């Protein structure tokens, strides 16, 4: 019997950095920025700094940033979940949630990333190309935009404000 494909991210569950199962439905009616992150990437400092800025600016207006460590690109996220969380929270003082380390491509890709990538993105196919690829998800749980890893988080502000209905 075939498994029913999810129709929104809210139908999926994920694991937090402590291994607890969390339903994404807890983020219903929020705008989500979902990012695959790495601690040892050349883009780490700029991305975390700008993600923090966006989060601090819009968290009270309905934005949630979900960060998913991934070690599939150049072994740039080799640490344990505890090491990763400690690094992000200590070095960058990030307050947005950091989740369990996942894979974003291949057979073992997280169901969340399989849903996000499904069929409508990327000139090189659906695969994530590197660390810090970003997906913007609307309040209905639909991925409405995908941004390349090199896209500065602050350049997403206009799109985020539109989804939050902020002029």
From Swiss-Prot:
Q: What are the record keywords, sorted? A: Oxidoreductase, Peroxidase
Coiled-coil blocks:
none
Specify the superkingdom: Eukaryota
Q: Name one GO cellular component term.
A: nucleus
An example of a GO molecular function for this protein is: glutathione peroxidase activity
Enzyme class comes to oxidoreductase
Residues annotated as catalytic: 41
Q: What is its EC number?
A: 1.11.1.9
The record's listing under CDD domains reads: GSH_Peroxidase (cd00340)
InterPro entries found in the cross-reference section: Glutathione_peroxidase (IPR000889), GPX_AS (IPR029759), GPX_CS (IPR029760), Thioredoxin-like_sf (IPR036249)
User: What Pfam families does the record point to?
Assistant: GSHPx
What is any one GO biological process for this UniProt entry? response to oxidative stress
Q: What Gene3D superfamilies does this protein's entry cite?
A: Glutaredoxin (3.40.30.10)
Question: Which reactions fall under this protein's catalytic activity?
Answer: 2 glutathione + H2O2 = glutathione disulfide + 2 H2O
Q: Which family does it belong to?
A: Belongs to the glutathione peroxidase family.
- Which PANTHER family does the entry link to? GLUTATHIONE PEROXIDASE (PTHR11592), GLUTATHIONE PEROXIDASE 8-RELATED (PTHR11592:SF27)
Main function: May constitute a glutathione peroxidase-like protective system against oxidative stresses.
The protein's name: Probable glutathione peroxidase 8
Gene that this sequence comes from: GPX8
